[in-house]
């Protein structure tokens, strides 16, 4: 989903009662695309590559010579790693800052334990990492060129200035057309004004 100047959506169950795992990532859009109309795309067949004991699904961006068809407005990547027990060397781009989130199982990165559900920040300048697991593990590798524009976020609003967030909140509260309309049995979420401190 690409928010552009604003988007609404509903997250509703399907009746499935098994266990689900999900990760929601927000990527700030660059100034030249953040005022465009919102968009949505569904990609059922994402490319994969095998590395040592890992199967890597390229959700977005490029990884190990494989390119996802998903839209991206900045130079970044998101890779779903399905790790079998053992050691896997994962290539990285040195100009990216990276992070790894362990979703299920457990692993170490270059010998350091990673707490499941937390982001292990790897910074810029690495060309590879070694992931070691004693059990089947699922992890998400994210990375990208450091963003060189200021970004503010409050609730679901992502902007560059307080004024933009205040305007977005007013438009949401007044149900302005910029956010669109969602036909859903769920109630529309209401939120109070931003708690700005005086400047």
What would you call each of these model-derived segments?
Residues 1-199:
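Jelly-roll (double-stranded beta-helix
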């Amino acid at each position: 989903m690409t928010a552009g100047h604003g988007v609404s959506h509903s997250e509703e169950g399907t009746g499935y009662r098994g266990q689900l795992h999900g990760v929601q990532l927000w990527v700030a859009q660059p100034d030249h695309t953040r005022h465009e109309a919102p968009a949505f795309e569904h990609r059922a067949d994402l490319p994969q590559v095998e590395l040592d004991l890992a199967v890597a699904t390229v959700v977005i961006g490029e990884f190990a010579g494989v390119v996802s068809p998903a839209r991206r407005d900045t130079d970044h990547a998101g890779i779903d790693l399905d790790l079998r027990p053992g050691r896997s060397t994962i290539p990285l781009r040195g100009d990216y800052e990276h992070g790894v989130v362990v979703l299920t199982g457990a692993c170490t990165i270059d010998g350091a334990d990673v707490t499941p559900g937390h982001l292990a920040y790897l910074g810029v300048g690495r060309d590879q990492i070694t992931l070691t697991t004693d059990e089947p593990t699922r992890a998400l590798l994210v990375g990208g060129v450091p963003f060189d524009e200021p970004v503010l976020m409050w609730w679901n609003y992502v902007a560059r200035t307080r004024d933009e967030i205040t305007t977005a909140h007013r438009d949401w509260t007044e149900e302005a057309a910029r956010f669109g309309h969602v036909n859903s049995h769920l109630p529309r979420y209401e939120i109070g004004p931003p708690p700005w401190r005086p400047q």
